[in-house]
Amino acid sequence: MKEIKSIEFKNEVLYLIDQRKLPNSYEIFECKTYRDVNFAIKEMVVRGAPAIGAAAAYGVVLAAKEFLKEDREIFFEKIEEALEVIANSRPTAVNLMWAVKRMKKVIEKNKELELIDIYQALKKEADSIYLEDIETNKKMAKFGNEVIKENAVILTHCNTGALATVGYGTALGVIREAHYSGKNIFVYADETRPRLQGSKLTAWELVQEGIPAKLIADSVAATLIRDGKIDVILVGADRIALNGDTANKIGTFMLSVIAKVYNVPFYVVAPTSTIDFEIESGKEIIIEERSPEEVTHINGVRIAPEGIEVYNPAFDVTPHENITGIITEKGIIKPPYKENILKLK
């Protein structure tokens, strides 16, 4: 199949697959300013921690391009404002701040150069983030494939594929690797309410690649696990604390609890850029709350009565004791997590 590119930057425009429109329509969303990128991240045109990080980096490039004709002092003021706007697009995914910090360091390091040279340096750094993500995902996939047995039945949650990254994917990247290495795997994909990333995105990627799979309602997962029909669970991550506590799409924690009860291996697949070395535990992770309409409506159609209140956290935190291992591009991290995570710093 044709390679899925969730992000592409060419001719000073950032092109994104509009993930709000999948699977029924394949449309490209064009970002010509950093404000467009801010909108795309907030409104989930682009989603998935690694993809958000790469998009944010190119957002800084677009900001630099926009302000090139300003006086130096104004240029740096405007860039600082743009960095702030982009950094605050969404609060939970650490890759967003990681990418913004990398771009900020480039500005600080090259502050004495001509503005056009600063722009070129920013473009080079964004390209590096983009290319690194692809390489990182392929390394993770190879390490992750080690935990996948022949004929394994895998359960996954949300979308962790090429759409959630620059390419290939994190947890879904491991699934791809196992499939292409001939392991005869089968996948159950949670639909992932309320945004339905499992049914709209993961199922779409699995169909595109010809990977044997079934889509299930989130509430079916516990029955499959109890009945011994799941060999391993693979999920992604939006932020990992020093002790291994992991913020991921809402519903991940629930899966980890059931997996622990029935002794099913539960792996997090994420690049080391998703580890937040500045927080000790998941208690410090800010959990984004999103619009009530995501729960009360599906595709614009109201499914709940007027007047009902809604609680809609986008993520939950899975405690480290429920996690079998964290698969990264540097290998598989096992408990004790803090001790082993610090070795990666």
Swiss-Prot record:
The protein, known as: Methylthioribose-1-phosphate isomerase
HAMAP family with a match to the protein in the record: Salvage_MtnA
Record-linked PANTHER family: METHYLTHIORIBOSE-1-PHOSPHATE ISOMERASE
Similarity comment: family membership: Belongs to the eIF-2B alpha/beta/delta subunits family. MtnA subfamily.
One Pfam family here: IF-2B
Known catalytic reactions: 5-(methylsulfanyl)-alpha-D-ribose 1-phosphate = 5-(methylsulfanyl)-D-ribulose 1-phosphate
Transition state stabilizer, annotated site positions: C158
Function: Catalyzes the interconversion of methylthioribose-1-phosphate (MTR-1-P) into methylthioribulose-1-phosphate (MTRu-1-P).
Pathway: Amino-acid biosynthesis; L-methionine biosynthesis via salvage pathway; L-methionine from S-methyl-5-thio-alpha-D-ribose 1-phosphate: step 1/6
InterPro entries listed in its UniProt record: IF-2B-related, IF-M1Pi, IF_2B-like_C, Initiation_fac_2B_a/b/d, M1Pi_N, NagB/RpiA_transferase-like
EC number(s) given by UniProt: 5.3.1.23
Organism encoding this protein: Thermoanaerobacter pseudethanolicus (strain ATCC 33223 / 39E)
Residue sites binding substrate per the record: R47, G48, A49, R90, Q197, N248, K249
GO biological process: one example: L-methionine salvage from methylthioadenosine
Molecular function per GO: S-methyl-5-thioribose-1-phosphate isomerase activity
Keywords, alphabetical: Amino-acid biosynthesis, Isomerase, Methionine biosynthesis
Catalytic residues (positions): D238
